[in-house]
């Protein structure tokens, strides 16, 4: 969990995660220069687990030249005493002209290859063992990340999941029903089952994110049932219930498939007990592969006994020099 006041930098941290994901998937990243130091160099990095192994990847991007001037990929090992050591698979430092790669043929190529993208997207990696495996690891990691904002969640993901009658869909429905004590059912139905004329122009949801003309019919077919009466969810349900319906598919999919769910402003329009319940689904012994990273304002969530370990609670602080992220584990009892 990431805590901090408004405008402290929590959302910027989420944007950094999104930028890293886009870079690793060879998508437009939107990287910007450092506004605090007025430097053209944007530096980002991530340490992550993939298939039970620990890796780190760092890169530097020159915004003005539009070049990746630094790349480093390492695997991190632990010995029996819990000491860590890094084994470098790839290092490309164009500024200091340091080039290393476990594939010797690639090491020779690095200085002469273009810098307008990551190295693994500039060469045919299938011909090189380690660089090819590195690319698969990075893509596999980035593909598992889902990033959503509670104030702007697309309902499309839940709609697509609700169309298929399977175990995943059943769990999504149960999740939504448990979140709303008065709801009997939640389903995706044929239009003839909806007992209301939805032709009035004024009957539109308040949330802009849910008022999407091209998907309007799909959204109307999402139906909530109260005391046996079917009503369109988008017109009758509360903002909180609609947000729960939108996030439900992401939560269940993450838990079932071991994905990484990143949520900005998790506590927006959702009751504290429900926020706590969502976090508890990820933070228990039954969850072996999924992870949720979230930002919140309500510090009461930190007060939940046995909910978090100290290293799972992070704070964001901003001053005139920059934004700092630090863990509760950095503090001792005396501090």
Name every feature range the model reports, one short phrase each.
Residues 54-56, 84-87, 230-232, 323:
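Short, mixed charged/polar active-site loops
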Residues 58-197:
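Electropositive, glycine-dotted interaction segments
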Residues 1-65:
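Conserved P-loop NTP-binding catalytic core
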Residues 257, 277-335:
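C-terminal lobe/lid and adjacent interdomain/linker elements of RecA-like ASCE P-loop ATPase modules
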Residues 19-30, 255-256, 283-289:
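Post-Walker A helix-loop "phosphate-sensing" segment adjacent to the P-loop in P-loop NTPases
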Residues 46-52, 74-79, 224-228, 318:
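Short acidic, glycine-rich loop/turn motifs
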Residues 271-276:
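Short alpha-helix of the ABC ATPase nucleotide-binding domain corresponding to the H-loop/switch region
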Residues 2, 201-252, 260, 266-270:
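Conserved ABC ATPase signature
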